[in-house]
Amino acid sequence: HDNLTLSVTLKSDASIRNQVVASVAKALKCSPAFPEDYESLKKAFRNPKLQMVSFTITEKGYATAPKYVQDDIPKGPEKCSTVICMVTALALERFKAGAFPFAFVSMDNCSHNGEKLQKGVMEVANAWKKLGFVDDGFIEYLSNPEKVSFPWSMIDKITPRPDGGVAKMLSSLGFEDTEVVVTGKNTWIAPFVNSEECEYLVIEDSFPNGRPRLEESGIYMTDRDT
């Protein structure tokens, strides 16, 4: 779908607003199994101008306790395949390129999300240090909030899985290819997203390399205490 998504907002007055979301410039597979895509991501992380990397990978994505993550850690930064290991490997790329500052921003709807992301990254990095893959300098880089920050955020927007009724409504309007697909992992995907009207996103304003003007998009920027 050319990285386009149709946002279907179900409003409180029973009306519906359809809007094409065209903010995704490019989609890449974050995995060494796809070397061309992965090299593009490495290049992005080596860019001194990179300001933030955001996450919506669910709370489970930050965990290091599962066996598949524990089995992945000893493979090291060059051969790992789990999300938390790969993002740590990409941070290592940035460290090696010049230890440039940036922010890792979790936008998953869970309490202390930035802390969970930081914990996962640090656990992987410390394990790699014990295994000889990284040195103290990398640990110090990740531990310095003036270099790498892990802002907390809070989001509220009910976005249920794609609804068959919405798909039929879109088809009646002439919108093509509305099929809802259920993957082998029971993930529901579709070329549209149906959601409620009420929404907000609050982010801790901790960005060591600067940030886009997020407040101009309606995002609330504040400190952690607030």
Regions found by a protein language model. Name each.
Residues 1-226:
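Substrate/ligand-engaging "lid" and interaction regions
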